[in-house]
Amino acid sequence: MSAVIKHSEERLMKVLLAPVISEKATFVAEKNEQVVFLVMPDATKLEIKAAVELLFKVQVESVQVANRQGKQKRSGRFNGRRNHTRRAFVCLKPGQEINFTEEAK
């Protein structure tokens, strides 16, 4: 049951907000061959997969998403909250690689 779903290129360009470059993301990338992205809160797994394949010209094996709640913070006597974020853990097929540390050409 392989349904081909067409997404507009305009929407796919907006789905990925930024790559996550952190110690944990680097560990996951090395161990599980995954790449971590911040994505739009309403992005689906199929949209994330299509966006990564379109922008980086790689083949995606699977996508896992995690919704992170914003932390409660206090500034003086005022309470606030950081924004909620949605992260996508994109597993690439063997032999595929996205490297953000190289210099752009």
From Swiss-Prot:
GO terms for MF: rRNA binding; structural constituent of ribosome
BP GO terms, sorted: translation
Matches recorded under InterPro entries: Nucleotide-bd_a/b_plait_sf, Ribosomal_uL23-like, Ribosomal_uL23/eL15/eS24_sf
Lineage top rank: taxon: Bacteria
SUPFAM superfamilies: Ribosomal proteins S24e, L23 and L15e
Span of the signal peptide: none
Keywords for this protein: Ribonucleoprotein, Ribosomal protein, RNA-binding, rRNA-binding
Pfam families: Ribosomal_L23 (PF00276)
CC per GO annotation: ribonucleoprotein complex; ribosome
Described function: One of the early assembly proteins it binds 23S rRNA. One of the proteins that surrounds the polypeptide exit tunnel on the outside of the ribosome. Forms the main docking site for trigger factor binding to the ribosome.
Family to which this protein belongs: Belongs to the universal ribosomal protein uL23 family.
Record PANTHER family: 60S RIBOSOMAL PROTEIN L23A (PTHR11620)
Subunit structure: Part of the 50S ribosomal subunit. Contacts protein L29, and trigger factor when it is bound to the ribosome.
Name of the molecule in the record: Large ribosomal subunit protein uL23
